[in-house]
Swiss-Prot record:
Residues engaged in binding ATP: Q90, G108, E109, G110, K111, T112, D509
CDD domains membership: DEXDc_SecA, SF2_C_secA
Lineage of origin: Bacteria, Bacillati, Cyanobacteriota, Cyanophyceae, Synechococcales
Record flagged with keyword Cell membrane: yes
Protein name: Protein translocase subunit SecA
InterPro entries: Helicase_ATP-bd (IPR014001), P-loop_NTPase (IPR027417), SecA (IPR000185), SecA_CS (IPR020937), SecA_DEAD (IPR011115), SecA_motor_DEAD (IPR014018), SecA_preprotein_X-link_dom (IPR011130), SecA_SF2_C (IPR044722)
SUPFAM superfamilies noted in UniProt: Helical scaffold and wing domains of SecA, P-loop containing nucleoside triphosphate hydrolases, Pre-protein crosslinking domain of SecA
Organism expressing this protein natively: Prochlorococcus marinus (strain MIT 9303)
């Protein structure tokens, strides 16, 4: 009713962009007449206008003035290079992003293409633009795909990947537009602020950032800070002993069922993700370990036992982590991908290694950390896009000061969201999922099933294999990760069945009928790899093809002969047939064979790396002009294969549309309604037909942990068969209530993480600013003398009480302390200070320090010119890093301890702020004092006589 009276505020907001859209459309005709070179020269024209405009505010005014023409130029370039033209609604999306807002754009509406508009415009300043995605695969895809537009227009495009060297990172960050993941950006920022030389710094000053899947990065991942750790020595045998004790302890029943304390050795709170020993548990653990007290400071055990219990109860193999090559590798809870190299902190990872009987790696200590909230707030202008932002609008506004605008779809939505089916037990739910998948598959429609863990995806895979339903599995297991792009390329084909772990975070569109462009590139890769790639690199064809080759082509026959006992094998064999839409004609096969021979002559026989070949195929897939004959030949081959595949893919697309489009099945409600909506959004892209349904059970984690007593009573109330779905308004309300409860719960956690990290953030920025000044070598001598002057002030204030008469001041102690710091003042006598006021004392000692420092500098510089500045930089960085590391530990300990002060009617956050501030001031004072002491004690070794080389 309010909307009818006042109008839709979002529509009113978007209406102001319409005149600019009209301007861009008017410019389109003139810009279409330009040649490629003339279009490219527009970039230089735009950039010239920024030559004398250096301040951020003035640059923003100029960017706004250039927007209509710049957007028209990008639209024309995208038409020529990608064959894609920005719709009017995409232009509006680009304006929303340019203004530093969050644009909600439904799945399939071309978010990736929209990002080219503001990223090009803001790159014209020369300050650099970061486009952020959730994983390396998407960053690479977008840099290759959308980067074509920017490269065509004369901008440089960089890409940051996990395994890059610092030199490669520096080169890529120096580009006009850099594609990277949120974690790589954050860790590079932390590493830059641990660098000991300016040449080690890879990032430049932040300017503008566009985040794809912004809710995933700024909301879902905001609970976990980015941490860089260093190793610390701890007795490793304790982890294994603790794991053995934990295995022997028994979990208590749920708390408070009959008002009686639970029996058992420890309690588990899944909501808080914590384990607590009972009195019996403490006694049993102490008895097993033969110790008197688990908290004995000389031999502490409590921390080890708690971590071992959490490893046993809360960290599940193939859900939270997988075991690969003798290591426990974390699985990202939001994307379902493995995160090699990442480890849980505080001894938790070691506890999991002990549980799994793996080699235990050394424990780590935090060297640097930051939350995503505070990291992204470092950008002067931040923007983001996602399919689902409106549900988190308040949090975006409060935490990040980001407005949210909903961009209208280009075509009306035609997706049907079918009613949820709820089952009493989990096993009944999975049988129902398998049955619906089989039914939809028979109709010739593609099916995407979203699961929440590796374990669940493999359970469903085995159920489908029993029914001989061919399917592809996409989860964190290594053999499946390697096939991600290939699986997604096929997921929209007629009858295709894809099981994906956390598909919501994968950011990849599923095209009805299949992606002929990618399949053509895959075919070319398959033909060229054995001829062009070095043998040690390996040239594995796509996984199912390789397995078929290993069995001499009788894969399906052998599986069939086994009377269904190898259902999974048969399922994969059938999936092989769907890898490519059709066989190529003999002419095209011969054409590809001839191409391989010609490329061997130019590039060498098996002389390339896999990455080099893939880069060349990616370049060939672009539409930008090329003078390279080999790239042109590759491009012709891709086009030829794609043309043949298109015939079948187009027919399949028609069949799939007629059958009803993609069907998406959710197998569990996520903790957030937004993530459920992301999964639904995979179906019905750009006005396509499609449908979705969620299958749930009363045993699902969400209902079990957050549903409370109401769900428990419902389980007893429903006296129906296991295989009968339950439909109940009361149950639906319980479900929505549970989701709202968990959303509020996690919002409070994120808010608390942010509030506490805000205290650290102010300190971090001060320390990192000091470090950067030192790295850049700006006024080092002046800075150290400033440290010395403040140290002299500290000494005076410590030993002189202004409330006492001057004759009672302990000047002997004061002089002794000054000489501890500055041994060159050994001739200073207390008599020289008599009769001076407190301020005069400070001034006198500061002058003495400056004179002593000049003498010290003369001594050091005699050894080697420039050595004094090197020593200053070394000692300042050494002290900052050492004391900051200790300060981080102290702040962690403070944060844990202030929680108890709530019982004393004190606000823990205010206590943390006040005490943390005092600790920070003390740390900075210690840093200044230690630097002064180190500088005066510094005695460089004489340079050794140069020996003749005897090599």
């Amino acid at each position: 009713m309010l909307k009818l009276l006042l109008g839709d505020p979002n529509a009113r907001k978007l209406k102001r962009y319409q005149p600019i859209v009209t301007d861009i459309n008017i410019l389109e005709e003139d810009i279409a007449l330009l040649s490629d070179d003339q279009l490219r020269s527009k970039t230089a024209d735009f950039r010239q206008q920024f030559e004398n405009v250096v301040s951020f505010p003035k640059q923003r005014v100029l960017l706004d003035e250039l927007l209509p023409e710049a957007f028209a130029v990008v639209r024309e370039a995208a038409k020529r290079v990608l064959g894609m033209r920005h719709f009017d609604v995409q232009l509006i999306g680009g304006m929303v992003l340019h203004e530093g807002q969050i644009g909600e754009m439904k799945t399939g509406e071309g978010k990736t293409l929209v990002a080219t508009l503001p990223s090009y415009l803001n790159a014209l300043t020369g300050r650099g633009v970061h486009v952020v995605t959730v994983n390396d695969y998407l960053a690479r895809r977008d840099a290759e795909w959308m980067g074509q537009v920017h490269r065509f227009l004369g901008l440089s495009v960089g890409l940051i990947q996990q395994d890059m060297s610092p030199a490669e990172r520096r080169r890529n960050y120096a580009c006009d537009i850099t594609y990277a993941t949120n974690s790589e950006l954050g860790f590079d920022y932390l590493r830059d602020n641990m660098a000991t030389d300016l040449s080690e710094v890879v990032q430049r000053e932040f300017q503008y950032c566009v985040i794809d899947e912004v809710d995933s990065i700024l909301i879902d991942e905001a609970r976990t800070p980015l941490i860089i750790s260093g190793q610390v020595e701890r007795p490793q045998e304790k982890y294994q002993q603790a794991a053995d004790v934990a295995a022997a302890l028994e979990r208590a029943a749920e708390q408070g069922k009959d008002g009686i304390d639970p029996e058992g050795d420890y309690e588990v709170d899944e909501k808080q993700r914590s384990c607590t020993l009972t009195d019996e548990g403490f006694a049993k653990a102490e008895q097993n370990l033969k110790v008197r007290d688990l908290f004995d400071p000389a031999d502490p055990w409590a921390h080890y036992i708690t971590n071992a219990l959490k490893a046993k109860e809360l960290f599940v193999r193939d859900v939270n982590y997988i075991v690969r090559d003798g290591e426990a590798v974390i699985v990202d809870e939001f994307t379902g991908r493995v995160m090699p190299g990442r480890r849980w902190s505080d001894g938790q990872h070691q506890a999991i290694e002990a549980k799994e009987q793996l080699a235990i790696q050394p424990e780590t200590q935090t060297l640097a950390s930051i939350t995503y909230q505070n990291f992204f707030l470092l950008y002067p202008r931040l923007a983001g896009m996602t399919g689902t932002a409106k549900t988190e609008e308040v949090e975006f506004e409060k935490t990040y000061k980001l407005e949210t605008s909903v961009i209208p779809t280009n075509q009306p939505r035609a997706r049907a969201d079918w009613v949820d089916q709820v089952y009493k037990t989990e096993s009944a739910k999975w049988r129902a999922v398998a049955n619906e998948t089989a039914e939809i598959h028979k109709q010739g429609r593609p099916v995407l099933v979203g699961t929440t863990s590796v374990e669940k995806s493999e359970l469903l895979s085995s159920l489908l294999s029993e029914q001989e339903i061919p399917h592809n599995l996409l989860n964190a297991k290594p053999e499946n990760v390697e096939r991600e792009a290939e699986i997604v390329a096929q997921a929209g084909r007629a009858g295709a069945v894809t099981i994906a772990t956390n598909m919501a975070g994968r950011g990849t569109d599923i095209i009805l009928g299949g992606n002929s462009d990618y399949m053509a590139r895959l075919k070319l890769r398959e033909v060229l790899l054995p001829r062009l790639v070095r043998p040690e690199e390996g040239h594995r064809p796509p996984v199912p093809l390789q397995r078929a080759a290993e069995t001499g082509g009788g894969f399906a026959a052998k599986a069939a002969a086994s009377n269904g006992s190898h259902g999974h094998v048969l399922s994969e064999a059938r999936a092989i047939g769907s890898l490519y839409p059709c066989s190529l004609t003999d002419d095209t096969d011969q054409f590809l064979a001839e191409l391989a021979r010609e490329l061997v002559k130019v590039w060498g026989d098996r002389a390339l790396s896999v990455i080099e070949l893939e880069d060349r195929i990616s370049t060939a897939a672009e539409k930008a002009p090329t003078d390279d004959a080999q790239i042109a030949a590759l491009r012709e081959s891709i086009a030829r294969v794609k043309t043949e595949y298109d015939v079948v893919v187009t027919q399949e697309e028609v069949r799939v549309r007629e059958a009803g489009g993609l069907h998406v099945i959710g197998t569990e409600r996520h903790e957030s309604r937004r993530v459920d909506n992301q999964l639904r959004g995979r179906a019905g892209r750009q006005g396509d037909l499609g449908s979705t349904r969620f299958f749930l059970s009363l045993e699902d984690n969400l209902l079990r942990i957050f549903g409370g007593e109401r769900v428990a009573s419902l389980m007893n109330a429903f006296r129906v068969e296991e295989d009968m779905p339950i439909e109940s308004g009361m149950l639906t309300r319980s479900l929505e209530g549970a989701q709202k409860k968990v959303e509020t719960y996690y919002y409070d956690i994120r808010k608390q993480v942010f509030e506490y990290d805000e205290v650290m953030n102010n300190q971090r920025r001060a320390v990192y600013a000091e470090r950067r000044r030192v790295l850049e070598g700006r006024g080092l001598k002046k800075q150290v003398i400033g440290y010395g002057e403040r140290t002299m002030d500290d000494v005076v204030e410590a030993y002189v009480n202004p409330d006492l008469p001057p004759e009672e001041w302990d000047l002997d102690q004061l002089v002794s302390k000054v000489q501890e710091f500055v041994y060159l003042l050994e001739d200073l006598k207390p008599e020289q200070l008599q009769g001076l006021s407190m301020e005069e004392l400070k001034s006198f000692l500061q002058e003495q320090l400056r004179n002593a420092y000049d003498i010290k500098e003369g001594q050091i510089e005699q050894q080697r010119p420039g050595l004094m500045r090197e020593a200053e930089r070394f000692f300042i960085l050494q002290q900052i890093d050492t004391l900051w590391r200790e300060h981080l530990q102290a702040m962690d300990a403070l944060r844990e301890s202030v929680g108890l002060r709530g019982y004393g009617q004190k606000d823990p956050l205010i206590e943390y702020k006040n005490e943390g501030y005092d600790m920070f001031l003390e740390m900075m004072a210690n840093m200044r004092r230690n630097v002064i002491y180190s500088m005066f004690m510094f005695q460089p070794a004489p340079a050794p006589a140069q020996e003749a080389a005897n090599v």
